[in-house]
Amino acid sequence: MISQSTLFLFILLIIGLIAKNQSLTVAIGVLFLLKFTFLGDKVFPYLQTKGINLGVTVITIAVLVPIATGEIGFKQLGEAAKSYYAWIALASGVAVALLAKGGVQLLTTDPHITTALVFGTIIAVALFNGVAVGPLIGSGIAYAVMSIIQMFK
C-alpha cells in the first residue's frame, strides 16, 4: 500500500512536471531518494529544522560570488549608492528582514499556519514558476496583515 506522504509527493511531482518546474521536481526527486533509501528517518528531521537556513546560506553564497570574483567592488558600490534603485533595494532588504522576524514569531506562536504557507509556496512554485523562499517571508507578511486586521477590530 502506498503511504499518504508518498502519494502526496507523487501528485506534487506530476504538478511540477506539468508546470515544467525544475526546482520542484528536483526537490521531490531528492525527497523520494531519501525516503526510499531509508535515509529519510535520519535526514528529514535535519532538513526540517535546518533546511531553510541551508537554503538561505546557498542563496547568500550565490549572491556574494560576484564580490568574490571581483566583478563587484567598492567602485560599483559607490556607483550604486548614487542610484535611487539601490536605495529602494536597501529599504526592501530591511523590510524583508523585519517581515521575516515577524514570521518567526508567528510560526512560534501559531505553528499550524505552516501548512497553509507550505501549500501557498507549492502553488506559487508549481503553477507560477515562483521561487520557494517562502515560509519566513510568507509568515512575516501574514503576521503583518494579521496585525493590521487586529488594529481595526
Curated annotation (Swiss-Prot):
Membrane-spanning residues: 8-28, 54-74, 87-107, 117-137
Main location: membrane
Cellular localization per UniProt: Cell membrane
InterPro entries associated with the record: UPF0756_TM
Protein family: Belongs to the UPF0756 family.
Its membrane topology: Multi-pass membrane protein
Keywords for this protein: Cell membrane, Membrane, Transmembrane, Transmembrane helix
Cellular component annotations (GO), alphabetically ordered: plasma membrane
Natural source organism: Bacillus cereus (strain Q1)
Lineage: Bacteria, Bacillati, Bacillota, Bacilli, Bacillales
Protein name: UPF0756 membrane protein BCQ_4399
Domain of life: Bacteria
